[in-house]
């Protein structure tokens, strides 16, 4: 069956609204875009809509060149009126993601991509984990107690696979985690021996029913374009034997709320 995340989604919405109402002024979220394509512009419109829904001020700044980023990001980080900053892709070719995200103050890095924020996860002290990784953790905690569960994470990206594995290993969560990737042999053997499988590999419908035992919780992080459709990394037929998050309408919806939550948290932290 497809997993119904609506109760989790609704509770997060109410939590954000309540926290914003207690602030003396609206939080401010800033997006920095470099060379936006049509999908980036659509993403920005979506984030602006969500921000306005919660009473969060939203602004977009353009930095077409690497030098523009090197000037703008430290300036925004030092601006007391700005609470959260996120950076869109694609980046200019002459600056790496590591270098770019390192220009954002860690306490305004609401996407959780700064090396300090990623490092905090290793010490079981996450402040702003990467939004998608946190969204997956929220969904897992909503569905079950992960303590002692065998969880396979398919994908090793710096924003999903790696940080999610570390979050699942935290004391108090205590999952047993296996990370798989493109060079992993016999992935099906691992996934069939897992209680929960998180798929974040970026290949449309790559994982079918032959990868899972009945009753497995399957979290599909993938977002792929196939013709006129948005599809995940997992074939929808898997829902016939497993609990599967839908694509679209699953992890992505929670990820957006985590971004807004982080913005509110940054505003709350700035008042302390």
UniProtKB/Swiss-Prot annotation:
Known EC number: 1.5.1.5, 3.5.4.9
Example of a GO biological process term: L-histidine biosynthetic process
Gene Ontology cellular component terms for the protein in this record: cytosol
GO MF annotation: an example: methenyltetrahydrofolate cyclohydrolase activity
A family per Pfam: THF_DHG_CYH
Keyword field: Amino-acid biosynthesis, Histidine biosynthesis, Hydrolase, Methionine biosynthesis, Multifunctional enzyme, NADP, One-carbon metabolism, Oxidoreductase, Purine biosynthesis
Binding sites annotated in the UniProt record for NADP(+): 155-157, 182, 223
Pathway given in the UniProt record: One-carbon metabolism; tetrahydrofolate interconversion
Origin: domain of life: Bacteria
Keyword Oxidoreductase: yes
Reaction it catalyzes: (6R)-5,10-methylene-5,6,7,8-tetrahydrofolate + NADP(+) = (6R)-5,10-methenyltetrahydrofolate + NADPH; (6R)-5,10-methenyltetrahydrofolate + H2O = (6R)-10-formyltetrahydrofolate + H(+)
Family: Belongs to the tetrahydrofolate dehydrogenase/cyclohydrolase family.
Subunit structure: Homodimer.
Function: Catalyzes the oxidation of 5,10-methylenetetrahydrofolate to 5,10-methenyltetrahydrofolate and then the hydrolysis of 5,10-methenyltetrahydrofolate to 10-formyltetrahydrofolate.
Name of the protein this chain belongs to: Bifunctional protein FolD
Species of origin: Fervidobacterium nodosum (strain ATCC 35602 / DSM 5306 / Rt17-B1)
């Amino acid at each position: 069956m497809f997993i119904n995340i609506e109760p989790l989604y609704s509770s997060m919405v109410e939590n954000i609204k309540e926290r914003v109402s207690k602030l003396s002024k609206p939080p401010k979220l800033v997006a920095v875009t470099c060379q936006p394509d049509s999908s980036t512009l659509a993403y920005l419109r979506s984030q602006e809509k969500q921000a306005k829904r919660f009473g969060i001020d939203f602004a977009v700044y353009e930095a077409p060149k690497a030098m523009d980023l090197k000037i703008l990001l430290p300036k925004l980080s030092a601006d007391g009126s700005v609470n959260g900053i996120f950076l869109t892709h694609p980046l200019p070719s002459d600056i790496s993601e590591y270098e770019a995200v390192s220009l954002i103050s860690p306490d305004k890095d609401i996407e959780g991509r700064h090396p300090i924020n990623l490092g905090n996860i290793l010490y079981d002290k996450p402040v702003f984990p990467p939004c998608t990784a946190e969204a997956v953790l929220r969904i897992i905690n909503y569905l079950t107690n992960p303590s002692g569960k065998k969880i396979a994470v398919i994908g090793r990206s710096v924003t999903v696979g790696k940080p999610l594995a570390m979050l699942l290993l935290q004391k108090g969560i205590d999952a047993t985690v296996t990370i798989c990737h493109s060079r992993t042999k016999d992935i099906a053997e691992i996934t069939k021996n897992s209680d929960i499988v998180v798929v974040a590999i970026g290949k449309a419908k790559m994982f079918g029913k032959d990868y899972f035992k009945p009753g497995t919780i399957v979290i599909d992080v993938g977002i792929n374009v196939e013709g006129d459709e948005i599809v995940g990394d997992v074939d929808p037929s898997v829902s016939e034997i497993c609990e599967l998050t839908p694509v679209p309408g699953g992890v992505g919806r929670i990820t957006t709320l985590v971004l807004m939550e982080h913005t509110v948290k940054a505003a709350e932290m700035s008042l302390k």
